[in-house]
Amino acid sequence: LDWKTSLTVKAHGLGKEEPVYHMEVSGPEYAQIFTARVSLGENGDIIGIGTGSSKRKAQLAAAEAGWKSLDSLKTRTK
């Protein structure tokens, strides 16, 4: 599984909303940097941020950060 799928599975397992990715692009057109922020639900708190040279890389990095955030939350609430 990739990080995006893993995050969706973990969110559903915890009874949370579907992950939503918000994208920003910066830098010149020949060297763009993509930044993804992931939240649970359209208006949820940001649980992960990632950057990359493509939209997919940024989303995967954000999903990994979000997965780790949810995992630490789950561990703290046990």
Language model segments and positions:
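Double-stranded RNA-binding/processing signature
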Residues: 1-78
